[in-house]
């Protein structure tokens, strides 16, 4: 039995209010933020989406994301604001009020921006404007899974079992030296977030939600309506993600 000293934080806006005001979380934080800012006249972000950014050698920049330029014409809002409003803002408020500093489990391999931050600050950034510790920065997903297997640690049922795979078949994680993965969800996070959903192979998060949490699925995929400006937004029946996922080719 494990006792947890937990303080539950609640955001000032709910998910429907956030999506209505700021837009849907699709593709990635980086791409969604580019679309949000480019639509508001940011020339730098527009150049990224058009594939016009060049590096110091005159070659196309790695920050270009022109394959997602079609989202500029999407009939709905797109942004990365949801994470900031529903998670980060609440955490920042708690930090100020409690005067406590965060220890987070972000890993550098999870994204280009996280890797750059780690190379610049290391695992502990105590001198910055927002001091924090990130002790798992140099860990990889395989490190985490192997740690769990070696120590026989319990994990949430939503992840299924940890198994080893040779690319064709799954084996008991302790019987073969191959890459590890979970038979259920590979990652968990906000239920109504579509960041990275286009990369999922096999049954994706929304298809899984359909049979594990049917009421949540209906709220997420169903609902939605056109507003006076011709933009698709949530309504009292649901978030309307179905039309959005259709637009980017993600199954549900």
Question: Predicted regions span which residues?
Answer:
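ATP/NTP-dependent adenylation/nucleotidyl-transfer catalytic domains that generate, transfer
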Residues: 128-129, 140-252
């Amino acid at each position: 039995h494990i006792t947890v000293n937990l303080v539950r934080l609640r955001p000032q806006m709910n998910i429907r209010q956030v999506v209505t005001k700021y837009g849907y979380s699709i593709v990635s934080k980086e791409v969604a933020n580019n679309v949000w800012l480019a639509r508001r006249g940011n020339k730098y972000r527009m150049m990224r989406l058009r594939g016009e950014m060049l590096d110091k050698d005159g070659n196309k920049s790695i920050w270009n994301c022109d394959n997602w330029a079609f989202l500029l014409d999407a009939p709905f809002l797109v942004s990365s604001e949801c994470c900031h409003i529903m998670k980060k803002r609440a955490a920042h408020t708690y930090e100020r009020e409690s005067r406590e500093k965060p220890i987070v489990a972000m890993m550098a391999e999870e994204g280009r921006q996280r890797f750059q931050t780690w190379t610049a600050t290391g695992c502990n950034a105590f001198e910055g404007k927002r001091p924090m510790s990130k002790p798992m920065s140099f860990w990889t997903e395989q490190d985490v899974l192997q740690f769990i297997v070696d120590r026989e640690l319990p994990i949430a049922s939503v992840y299924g079992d940890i198994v080893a795979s040779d690319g064709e078949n799954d084996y008991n994680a302790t019987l073969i030296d191959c890459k590890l993965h979970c038979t259920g969800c590979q990652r968990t996070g906000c239920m109504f977030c579509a960041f990275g959903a286009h990369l999922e192979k096999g049954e994706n998060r929304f298809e899984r939600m359909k049979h594990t949490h049917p009421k949540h699925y209906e709220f997420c995929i169903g609902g939605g309506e056109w507003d006076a400006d011709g933009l698709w937004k949530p309504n009292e029946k649901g978030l309307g993600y179905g039309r959005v996922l259709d637009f980017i080719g993600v199954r549900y």
